[in-house]
Amino acid sequence: MDILGVLTAELGVKMSQVEAAVKLIDEGNTIPFIARYRKEVTGSLNDEVLRNLDERLKYLRGLEDRKTQILASIEDQGKLTADLKKKIEEAETMVAVEDLYLPFRPKRKTRASMAKERGLEPLADTILLQMTKEPMETLAAQYVSEVKGVANAKEAIDGAKDILAERISEVAKYRAYIRNVTKEEGSIVSAVKDEKTESVYEMYYHHEELVRKCAGHRILALNRGEKEKILTVKIAAPEEKILRYLNKMVITRENPVTTPVLQEVIADSYNRLIAPAIEREVRNLMTEKAEDGAIKIFGKNLEQLLMQPPIAGRVVLGWDPAFRTGCKLAVVDATGKVLDTVVIYPTAPQNKVEDAKKTLKKLIEKYKISLISVGNGTASRESEQIIAEFIKEIPEYVQYVIVNEAGASVYSASKLATEEFPKFDVGQRSAVSIARRLQDPLAELVKIDPKSIGVGQYQHDMNQKHLSEALGNVVEDCVNKVGVDLNTASASLLEYISGISKVIAKNIVVYREENGAFTNRRQLLKVAKLGPKAFEQCAGFMRIAGGDNPLDGTSVHPESYKAALELLKRAKIEPEEIAKGGAAGISKKITDYKKLSEELEVGEETLKDIVKELEKPARDPREEMQKPVLRTDVLDMKDLKPGMILKGTVRNVIDFGAFVDIGVHQDGLVHISQLSRKYIKHPLEAVSVGDIVEVKVLGVDMAKKRISLSMILDEE
């Protein structure tokens, strides 16, 4: 197989781009590094295309390795023909390769293998030849043998039929046809095991739809219902059509002796051997496709969450709500340093609201708090009402935000949190995390397993290795897009930087603690286990503010410093200007990028990136994102009326719509049909996590705590 050719066709890019990207990957370069600093080499392939290329490259190489193993196995058996070898070499999927290998795969004892041991294969061959005119019993009588364990003609015929059934089931062409027909025309059918059972799966108690039309979230729901033993799920294939096909392929001539036998063999082969295997395969394919879709959604949601803009320069009060154990508060300064922690008891059973307000007033006056970050877990609703009341009673201008606290409890009980705050209990740590994830979501959320962040669907039912790998890639891409401050970044953040492992990340922090702040990027080479290759991969993503070299505070890679300094010299700008806010207007002095790039001996795309960076050093891509909605008052669900227009934040995007926080504690659902006037295939075409949107209330169900919303505001 021409792997490079396949990748070129699949990705819709040039062969030269694929060749270059594969070479760079094989040389140990990371995806963020290739996407950012090797644009000329790859023709500016972005990180998304490079990730797809890398994933497919691994699959196709794995496929080639499997082909090599299979060809060697069949050759060892002395059964490899030129035609079979060609078919295996040209197969494009693992399923096709395994189909071709099936007849030669070492088997456990089967009815067919036992029949062969009893010497019945020649009888099977005679039946399949379809030439005999002798009655079947007469033919079979020749194979009756006490020694071989064939007691009578019927046993001989049954054994021959078993051999033929297995042989038919192993023909790759038949399996491919049946698989395709099952996928295209088959249905997935579910039923409830006990009609009296009440569950969230009621819509699937008597459900049937075409396999090819079953949406990913429904596949995952059916799988979960089956796993929880509430539903039975099966694939109903067009059996009559399949049997007609097999009869046509196997029965090549009408023979009154062999035709009835072969018809029985075909039915048995399909029902006993082929159908269960194809059903498993189709279910697995459906699940894989559904999981891939869910992982993509999870990844997009996670990216939006991580790339939320930081709220800088404000002292924040983190509020971890609770009932019996009290609400834990943590005051965090503008740099994320913890100034104070307190526990108050304004909620049931103690209801010490006035005491809580006095404590809040003291904290706000003492630390000049202007923003309260409230976790959205247990007792959040009650806490929000108290905060809104309190804000009205004080002269200071204070706002609050409801923050998704998913994962905060996981973090607060982790080894990492214990190391960071050894003297704090889990509640205090959680309050700190809730405050910090508002100040700098990326820096705080990288401390939490992405699976615990709560922006996916059915994540616990998926292939955990695949999920972790995909989400890890998302975090890596986000961290490298933003970059880190080498002197303040935690080990949790550093480990996602291109070329940096967990061990090296910890070594960087240790070096910092032992030697003080880094003053230039070259000092990274003094860090234990950080060699020249790791330095090449990581240096551009690590910034040093106020260091020896102003370029170290930018995302210009050290390999391009010579070109950057020459560019500044030609523009008559001192390097020190970079540290003061950038070399404004430098792009206006360039008339011919191509010519200049040749003179400076850098690529044209790299030159453009250098210019952008010199004009606005260490620009943060998160600044372009929408900031969270800050509130001073609270709404109650019972206050909502159909037709009301509200502003909200998209909290989660799933296959069938988006959940929006409108400030009433219960997120409302905007169904996919209400996201846009135009037809969209998926909600992500209209919204992303973190988007600030205007919505109209369609309906409120107080009993079920459901709010229906629409983003189609005007009537046509």
Could you say what each language-model-derived stretch is?
Residues 37-39, 128, 238, 321, ...:
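Short, ordered loop/turn segments at secondary-structure junctions
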Residues 49-52, 59, 63, 68-318, ...:
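Duplex nucleic acid-engaging cores and interfaces of nucleic-acid transaction enzymes
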Residues 30-31, 42, 46-147, 481-624, ...:
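Accessory alpha-helical DNA-binding modules that contact the DNA backbone or grooves
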Residues 96, 401, 407, 412-482, ...:
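Long, charge-rich intrinsically disordered scaffolds of nucleic-acid metabolism proteins
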Residues 281-299, 452-483, 597-642:
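Long, charged amphipathic helices and adjacent flexible linkers at domain junctions
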Residues 139-153, 207, 245-270, 274, ...:
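Low-complexity, acidic/Ser/Thr- and charged residue-rich accessory regions of DNA metabolism proteins
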Residues 180-188, 319-323, 377-379, 403-410, ...:
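A glycine-rich phosphate-binding loop feature that marks nucleotide/adenosyl-phosphate handling sites
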